[in-house]
From Swiss-Prot:
Keyword DNA damage: yes
Residue stretches making up the Helicase ATP-binding domain: 27-192
Motif Beta-hairpin: where in chain: 93-116
Subcellular localization: Cytoplasm
Organism: Nitratidesulfovibrio vulgaris (strain DSM 19637 / Miyazaki F)
Family per similarity comment: Belongs to the UvrB family.
This protein's name: UvrABC system protein B
Amino acid sequence: MTQSPFILRTDYEPRGDQPEAIGQIVSNIEAGVTDQVLLGVTGSGKTFTMAQVIARCGRPALVLAPNKTLAAQLYNEFRQLFPENAVEYFVSYYDYYQPEAYVPSSDTYIEKDSSINDNIDKLRHAATHALLTRRDVVIVASVSCIYGLGSPEYYAKLVIPVETGQRLSMDALITRLVEVQYERNDYDFHRGTFRVRGDVLEIIPAYHHERALRIEFFGDDIDAISEIDPLTGQVLASVGKTVIYPASHYVSDRDNLVRAISDIRDELGERLRELKGGNRLVEAQRLEQRTMLDLEMMEEMGYCNGVENYSRHLDGRKAGDPPSCLLDYFPDDFLLFVDESHITVSQVGAMYKGDRSRKSTLVDYGFRLPSALDNRPLEFHEFLARLNQAIYVSATPGKWELDRSQGIVAEQIIRPTGLVDPITEVRPTKGQVDDLLGECRLRAARDERVLVTTLTKRMAEDLTEYFNEMGVAARYLHSDIDTMERMAIIQALRRKEFDVLVGINLLREGLDIPEVSLVSILDADKEGFLRSAGSLIQTFGRAARNVEGRVLMYADVVTRSMQAAMDETARRRERQTGYNEAHHIVPATIRKAVETPFDAIYAEAAEAKGRKGKGRKGAAQAAETFAPWSSDPHELAKQIQQLERDMREAAKELEFERAAELRDRIRLLREHLLGAGGAG
């Protein structure tokens, strides 16, 4: 095996089942095994095992997560494990997204409406930039990575190399920058823009916030290249040569654009004849007006709103061909880790059908050309065709993963902490609420927390209200609560602002809370998705990070799913306790800071600034400067927007020190939001 470019930084050695699992997975990869499963119980260190495998194999890796929040958590963990390598984050960059749609029954057209998170867009560009420039790359992504992205061939083809002494006029460079969708803005200098001052051109690349490039010209030659602070103009480093990557993934050179526009006109003519032949004159007029407006903008600007709907023509694909996506940016030998595979695999399979249904209506009624159907996520078989070697990671792998891997399973049942699976108990449903209330009071008195899962939203609300009336502080989670607020509620539970969290689906992200010593499942004998054997095992795992962990199921009969879940938990528990006895291990509850992984950055920034101040007073002022104003993620987002306005105003007034302070604060607040799972 060649030397790995990854440097794993950790104070821990693999323990429990980790050494055997790591060795087995690495051996299988080296032997060419294409699919295998890592079955790891909650708290067994699956992320650490993945990192060890990546470091030993030395290949670029994609870690696929079922949602943005879990992706953010994994991103933070991998950044800490690989601080010297490229760990990047690739999720949907929309803070808000209302897709274009048409409802024929009410003749209602819903225009696309969205809000793009600039920080996430930067991270997406950083991800593709890393993949095209180095091999020591780990990309943590949500399933949005299977959606269409610009062709990597065109993206790489349109990079702009610059170096000192190069014969290149400023006008020629400006023309090329505009072609790859950079905008000139001499007043509001931000990511994806450039400005000109005399013989100096400055640009902030699409994959940077904090650094800009300064290119100085002497006549038609490049005289010097520097990296600078975009706010203060301070030179950070001299650069002999560099490469500027496009500001958009949907870029095309002029020749290709001319060909694409011609192809779009041909398709439009063909579709109009078809619609008029069917006497659908309204649809024909609508389609012609909308498409001609887009073509006019593409001819003038090189792009248009919704340009992704023409991606088939821009990429030169045939009808029905799959789009390029993030997977196409990886080299052929990459590794894929599908985290929480029992959820993620089915998500990948479902993406195409939902997208197709919505767009078919738009095409049928003249809002889009048929080629818009090819701006889509990958179909499941297309996704599989792009894989090289995959590891499916879950505490409860599904039948598909087990069949796909032909029984090649590495088990992590033993936790490095010595913690064992919780004891499970079944009690009758009669009087279940008051019985549970008593259990909650016991846990609250011991400074422990409780998770309760119900069948309906109404029951969750009623139970929460009743517990609060009876003096037990409780809150509930439901589908109306967005990701950021959800993380805030979970942090509040850990801080003991309340003791009982009630919800319908406690299988979602962010609920591995070491303070939880009791998980209660009401109406456990009502069969369904959330009461299947796999779901029950996942729910049991929420109590597996506390040495006092218990599971209470309220049911009048023991269903097949309940029995299977209890049997599997008993099997794991027996093996875990046996290992502990043999190795003289005494389990202890995990101690974990309540703060997000980014909170240490606040402390470091405050301390550094405090050293420049006057003793304790300087440190106190620094802490006030760098601490977030609010723990509410919505408020944090508003604060960031206000601070960005203040920063630009300060820079305009030449108050560079003030602007730099605001810049640092914005960066920390953005990372705080990302650590809380709210980054887009």
